[in-house]
Amino acid sequence: VSLHADRGELLAVVGPSGCGKTTLLELICGLQAPEAGSLQCAPAALMPQRDLLLPWLSAVDNAALALRIAHVPRTQARERAAKLFAELGLEGFEQSRPHELSGGMRQRVAFSRTLLSGKDVLCLDEPFGALDAITRAELQTWLLDALSMEPRTVVLVTHDVEEAILLADRVAVLSPRPGRVIASLEIALERPRKRTDPEIIELRERALNVLQMGIQR
């Protein structure tokens, strides 16, 4: 796989199941080592498909977990997490336990935890895949708002081609296993983007056609 992401870019990666999208994120985050080739990347944090919130911790303590692992004092870690909660629409839920939160709220807490890692690159693995359509659309907008306040380079893995086009600056399309980049689509459209925009529909069809051709080879 030959791939790059510019600083501050939101790069979406789409491809069929089993093509190596999650493995790619794990390589970027240093959780796996490449068997060949080279990888150059700024420090990166992974937000996995499941939120993995610890049930015995409050929302704010879950978000502050990366800071605590980095030996930031508990009070300071909570203060930083609470400040981010206020910015990201989580104010008032600081002391809630995970089971008291909706799926969308849990994902917001998980994203806050990833942000508080302080890494320059965020790797998001299907962050909205388990959510209903309405909540998913709300969180897509929320993600862009959050990144406008806390800019990062983002690599977003998704099975949803439309989601990729709505959110990303560029979409990399992978072939079936063994995954390789078979297309890179620049999304030079202003935000917010609407699903019904003719340009979005055209780009979605282009991406789906590339995916289909890759599967048939």
Model regions and ranges:
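Conserved ABC ATPase "signature" region
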Residues: 75-93, 145
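Conserved ABC ATPase signature
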Residues: 97-101, 105
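Helix-to-loop junction immediately C-terminal to a conserved catalytic motif
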Residues: 29
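Short coil-to-helix segment of the ABC ATPase nucleotide-binding domain corresponding to the Q-loop/switch region
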Residues: 57-64
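The feature captures the beta-strand-to-loop junction immediately N-terminal to the Walker
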Residues: 14-16
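Catalytic Walker B motif of ABC-type/P-loop ATPase nucleotide-binding domains
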Residues: 122-126
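A short, proline-enriched helix->beta-strand linker immediately N-terminal to the Walker B motif
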Residues: 116-120
